[in-house]
Curated annotation (Swiss-Prot):
Known function: One of the components of the core complex of photosystem II (PSII). It binds chlorophyll and helps catalyze the primary light-induced photochemical processes of PSII. PSII is a light-driven water:plastoquinone oxidoreductase, using light energy to abstract electrons from H(2)O, generating O(2) and a proton gradient subsequently used for ATP formation.
Transmembrane segments: 21-36, 101-115, 140-156, 203-218, 237-252, 457-472
Family per similarity comment: Belongs to the PsbB/PsbC family. PsbB subfamily.
Classification lineage: Eukaryota, Viridiplantae, Streptophyta, Embryophyta, Tracheophyta
Protein name: Photosystem II CP47 reaction center protein
Gene label: psbB
Organism: Populus trichocarpa (Western balsam poplar)
The keyword Chloroplast belongs to this UniProt entry's keyword annotation: yes
Keywords carried by this UniProt record: Chlorophyll, Chloroplast, Chromophore, Membrane, Photosynthesis, Photosystem II, Plastid, Thylakoid, Transmembrane, Transmembrane helix
Length: 508
């Protein structure tokens, strides 16, 4: 046809057979990418330390999505929760990846078949003999089938009636595992952090989809509505489909960035708001306070804090700390976490307990300031020593560790105290291996950040695509230069200006 590059799919506009072919090929590409990406991630994934080197620290992108849907075992003999297994079954990580690749191959062959055999009887209008699609009927079919899939997922897969269930965890991401979920039909089902809402909403939405699909299969649209919404134009389908996709992309960008039951922190990493609000820090202090109330020593109380909980309370796991254009996993940034050094407790020479003010998310550098329990500044690391009043040396600050690898160790040397005060700005202190991956020490974002950025960006792009194609289909006659109020039969080529009888061409 000699179309320019930006006309992309115009070639299949009036060709239902090949329109179907390119959509099947698109599905083949998507499924093929998913399967291949899964195999690549499995090849580089290290499952040995699910606490300090989980999937999200390693930059895994598709493994978390498989895991939240109930896949936990590998044909390599490991489980995502740690330990070894002997019989992973067919639906392991590799099994799912292989199924996607096989499906991709079948779609590839189907796409070729439909490209070659494009002129099928099913695409022909009996009355005119020309290629034609009954778009309202196709809409009904798709709505019905997607409703069945949606209902089936909620009623069988999520509930464990016929399926594994989904990943469910506690609010602090410590006890996560795959389990069946009962639908939440009360008001609690609208809480985005309640897993039961996933089951109930899929059942409800699926039921609605089935009923709506049957409605559109059995009821024809009124002529005025059909013409007003251009229901006979395939570009209307494109426009409304893009709308559905960009709306979904905006929704999942939100649920990922702000957190929800569908995006567990064990699989995707914590959210930035958990750092901003001191979410894990408060829980750690609550547990320590409970231990002290039970007559435990500080050392005993801090030693009972799970390493996993302490690791969440570290700024390097904040997805907003990594720049959008810093490629690589979190492990490539600050390194692979080896162990928790323990909680540093600072005191001045008068015995007051001091707390290091933590670095806010969007700061790269931050002054080291130590405050007492009332928030009064008692010590700092000054920029200009000549004018300092609260320096570590002047105030006589010491540090002692509780829990972790340095449990019971104390330091009074100012240089060492300042070193740990600087590190305490970043939350709990961990030993990090930067040699293995040649990590550069610059923070990276987690898959939570990448997913959000990608989906928000494409949602914005697709929003403009919806406006573009929607206006093209609604105002097609205007763009073509044909007056919609013109009743007379227009003979193309009879006038110099289309539809203007005053410009009739003169026959010489």
């Amino acid at each position: 046809m000699g179309l320019p590059w930006y006309r992309v799919h115009t070639v299949v506009l009036n060709d239902p057979g090949r329109l179907l072919a390119v959509h099947i090929m698109h599905t083949a590409l998507v499924a093929g990418w998913a399967g291949s990406m899964a195999l690549y991630e499995l090849a580089v994934f290290d499952p040995s330390d699910p606490v300090l080197d989980p999937m999200w620290r390693q930059g895994m992108f598709v493994i978390p999505f498989m895991t939240r849907l109930g896949i936990t075992n590998s044909w390599g003999g490991w489980s995502i929760t740690g330990g070894t297994i002997t019989n992973p079954g067919i639906w392991s990580y590799e099994g799912v990846a292989g199924a996607h690749i096989v499906f991709s191959g079948l779609c590839f062959l189907a796409a070729i078949w439909h490209w070659v055999y494009w002129d099928l009887e099913i695409f022909c209008d009996e009355r005119t003999g020309k290629p034609s699609l009954d778009l309202p009927k196709i809409f009904g079919i798709h709505l019905f089938l997607s409703g069945v899939a949606c209902f089936g997922f909620g009623a069988f897969h999520v509930t464990g009636l016929y399926g594994p269930g989904i990943w469910v965890s506690d609010p602090y991401g410590l006890t996560g595992k795959v389990q069946s979920v009962n639908p939440a039909w009360g008001v609690e089902g609208f809480d985005p952090f309640v897993p039961g809402g996933i089951a109930s909403h899929h059942i409800a939405a699926g039921t609605l989809g089935i009923l709506a699909g049957l409605f559109h299969l059995s009821v024809r649209p009124p002529q005025r509505l059909y013409k007003g919404l251009r229901m006979g134009n395939i570009e209307t389908v494109l426009s409304s489909s893009i709308a559905a996709v960009f709306f979904a992309a905006f929704v999942v960008a939100g649920t990922m960035w702000y957190g929800s039951a569908t995006t567990p922190i064990e699989l995707f990493g914590p959210t930035r708001y958990q750092w901003d609000q001191g979410y894990f820090q408060q829980e750690i202090y609550r547990r320590v306070g409970t231990g002290l109330a039970e007559n435990q020593s500080l050392s005993e109380a801090w030693s009972k804090i799970p390493e996993k909980l302490a690791f969440y309370d570290y700024i390097g796991n904040n997805p907003a700390k990594g720049g959008l254009f810093r490629a690589g996993s979190m492990d490539n940034g600050d390194g692979i976490a080896i162990g928790w050094l323990g909680h540093p407790l600072f005191r001045d020479k008068e015995g007051r307990e001091l707390f290091v003010r933590r670095m806010p998310t969007f700061f790269e550098t931050f002054p080291v300031v130590l405050v007492d329990g009332d928030g009064i500044v008692r010590a700092d690391v000054p920029f200009r020593r000549a004018e300092s009043k609260y320096s570590v040396e002047q105030v006589g600050v010491t540090v002692e560790f509780y829990g972790g690898e340095l449990n019971g160790v104390s330091y009074s040397d100012p240089a060492t105290v300042k070193k740990y005060a600087r590190r305490a700005q970043l939350g709990e202190i961990f030993e990090l291996d930067r040699a293995t991956l040649k990590s550069d020490g610059v923070f990276r974002s987690s898959p939570r950040g990448w997913f959000t950025f990608g989906h928000a960006s494409f949602a914005l792009l697709f929003f403009f695509g919806h406006i573009w194609h929607g206006s093209r289909t609604l105002f097609r006659d205007v763009f073509a230069g044909i007056d919609p109020d013109l009743d007379a039969q227009v003979e193309f080529g009879a006038f110099q200006k289309l539809g203007d009888p005053t410009t009739r061409r003169q026959v010489v």
